Amino acid sequence: MADDFVPGLEGVIAFETTIAEPDKDGGSLRYRGVDIEDLVGKITFGNVWALLVDGKFGPGLPPAEPFPIPVHSGDVRVDVQAALAMLAPFWGYRPLLDISDDEARDQLARAAVMALSYVAQSARGIGNPAVPQSRVDEAATIVERFMVRWRGEPDPRHVAAVDAYWTSAAEHGMNAST
């Protein structure tokens, strides 16, 4: 066996990215050069989304449009996939090759928040009435809107926990373990 043989994928670079940068020792993670410790609990997920997608802080995710979920199968994944597929032709989305980068970004943001809205609506369950849009509109962040749409009156600690989780998991990246 050769002296330079290393089993597995140790040392193999599959690709390079500027979006997420874990340190080699696993002690820290940076999104676009910003340490995750400076984001979690300090910057809302909607604005972290802007950092990841746009490369800078700015207008994050817009509020979802008040479309009720049109499918209730009892399976959140099925409901969301079916509902999102209905929006593209309704909104007139065209193939990515036929639109500008700015239009693609706006469409991605619009679809992303609708996915969150549909997850919340489906997870709320068929037997529970929808939360009034006026209540959803009182929420200050994308995560709070999600939680209100799902739970009605969420515990602020739960909103903070979900926001922290979504921020920390927003860019998993692709590493040898995946």
Each model region followed by its residue ranges:
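Hydrophobic alpha-helical bundle cores within soluble ligand-binding/oligomerization subdomains
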Residues: 1-178
